[in-house]
Amino acid sequence: MLHIAICDDDAWMASKVEALAKIFFRTHCVDIKVQSYQSSENLMYDLQDGVYYDLLLLDIEMPGIDGMGLAKNIHDNMPAARIIFITSHLEYAITAYEFSVFRYIPKTALDDKLPVALEDFYKLYGLERSEYYVIKVKLILC
């Protein structure tokens, strides 16, 4: 089961992101558990209490702790978790990659870009958890 967090102070946008994520993963027969937060502080408290998410869909501009502050904390404490920023503020795009952000999606392109980002995330997630590894070796004959 995938654990997904959505954090956006705009309840309508958080609901839309959640609906798109549920549709995507349902069509791929993937069980997910989604937790939505309208307060970045509440998400931060849960993270400090040890709650783990595989994927976090974050807004950047929020009251209190902004998305960049959340991303830094997540990057430092849950390096395997993936972050997708969904924002109206494109000016933070370069800085966002300092925290290994997986994708940066403008809210105006959400319907087109989020399913593609989720597809790419799911492929990577599957590869990272695969039970099979390819080991390249060089054959040396003596």
Residue ranges with predicted function:
Residues 116-142:
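Conserved binding/recognition cores within well-folded domains
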